[in-house]
Amino acid sequence: MIEYMNYVIKSLQSNNDYEHLTLSSRSLLNFKIPNAFKFQLSNKSTPYTYNTIDISTNKVINGSITYLYTDAKGLDKLIKDSHNINIQSIVETYNHHCKTLNINKQNVDFKSLYYGRMYYPNSHLEGMIIKKFTTNTQVVLKWVSSFNSCNIITGYFQKYGKRNFQELIVSSNDFLCGYRFLHNFIEQPSKLNNSLYNNSYISLGGEFWLAISTLSPTCATTLRYCTHSATTGRPLTLTLSFNPLFGHLSSTYSAKTSSNSAFCVQYDFNLYSIDSNLSLGCELWKQNELIQNVSQEKSKKQEIQVPPNFYNNNSNDAKQKRILNDLNTTFESSLKKIDKERAVIENFETDLYNKDFTSVWKFSTSLRDKNLCILWDGKFKGFLLSAGTELIRINTNNENNSQSLVKFYPAKLGLQLQFST
């Protein structure tokens, strides 16, 4: 479960960038597990300012104070308190990349955003400034400061587009410079209608880095394919990532198996060391059984009526008329099939968006790490709760006999509570 300030920033930013190219697999496999007790209290003091204070206990008491200001208007329609928030908005879950998801999404325009956070008792500071010059270009400045002379400043110049994304990065840490890009290969809409195939597209992204102080380069590229099932309308995503310098190859398959579940499998392989790993992850959503949304009825498919002899009504030849009637019947069935596929996709995503979920279970495991990660996110009486653990496998020797026993013990265990007004 993401924090409140990240939820506010996420509502203002686009996820059409290289960083979110493999978001679906990361959300199902590498989700964050709390390792201590943490309580976070947030509120919206003015229409443009947000405040957060949190306290955590991990052997010692730690905490932080966060402040955010933005000149965005109309955030009341997007930012909800913990009692009215949609749990799908604050949980890192399967990311729908296809175009039909933007059913009820609203765009909020803003020119600047200021974010600051101070940790205590160590007094670490972190901040961020986002300044938009145009609708598609912005500059992001992030910095981290502490008393042990650890001061890092990183600047980003980002340019967004419907199909393209470009980003230049400069950091004071080893004078690191980087360039990241993303291009979406979207098929042109059909002249007849928007069909299933217009919701399938390929995304290609890459990143190039160079540490000027040590002259250490690195690069990576990622390919993503998104589509829907023709019969059920459920989305699925395939990614392939490759780092040529380290020889790391990673492939993922993520699918929304139903409106209440998602599954992901990832296979990693190194070309140089021949090491491999297989990771599995899934999430199970629970719907509120007391509150049923009446408006979740499936929309009726729109049938396109093609009149007989549509292409030629002036032919006097009986044989030619029979051929034209066969052509009309063929095109009519194709149009109905196109509309049926589109209706199935739109109905699935509309039904998913309108469902009232109360909690979600997440599970992930890895053959190489031999662990089991469990996370539960949910709502209870206006509070947002997140509890999880990571079980790892260890071998212990039995004193009575020399046989080794396999045991599992929790390497991480924690509980996080959030409340916002």
Curated annotation (Swiss-Prot):
Q: What does this protein do?
A: Component of the ERMES/MDM complex, which serves as a molecular tether to connect the endoplasmic reticulum and mitochondria. Components of this complex are involved in the control of mitochondrial shape and protein biogenesis and may function in phospholipid exchange. MDM10 is involved in the late assembly steps of the general translocase of the mitochondrial outer membrane (TOM complex). Functions in the TOM40-specific route of the assembly of outer membrane beta-barrel proteins, including the association of TOM40 with the receptor TOM22 and small TOM proteins.
Question: Which family does the similarity line name?
Answer: Belongs to the MDM10 family.
Quoted from the entry, the domain comment is:
Lacks alpha-helical transmembrane segments, suggesting that it resides in the membrane via beta-sheet conformations similar to those predicted for other outer membrane proteins and porin.
GO BP annotations of the record are:
establishment of mitochondrion localization; mitochondrial genome maintenance; mitochondrial outer membrane translocase complex assembly; mitochondrion-endoplasmic reticulum membrane tethering; peroxisome organization; phospholipid transport; protein insertion into mitochondrial outer membrane
Q: Does the keyword Membrane apply?
A: yes
One GO cellular component term: SAM complex
Q: What keywords are assigned to this protein? A: Membrane, Mitochondrion, Mitochondrion outer membrane, Transmembrane, Transmembrane beta strand
What membrane topology term does the record carry?
A: Multi-pass membrane protein
Q: Supply the Pfam families for this chain.
A: MDM10
Does the keyword section mention Membrane?
Answer: yes
Name the domain of life this protein comes from: Eukaryota
Signal peptide per UniProt? none
Question: Assembly state and interactors?
Answer: Component of the ER-mitochondria encounter structure (ERMES) or MDM complex, composed of MMM1, MDM10, MDM12 and MDM34. Associates with the mitochondrial outer membrane sorting assembly machinery SAM(core) complex.
- Localisation: Mitochondrion outer membrane
Q: What is this protein called?
A: Mitochondrial distribution and morphology protein 10
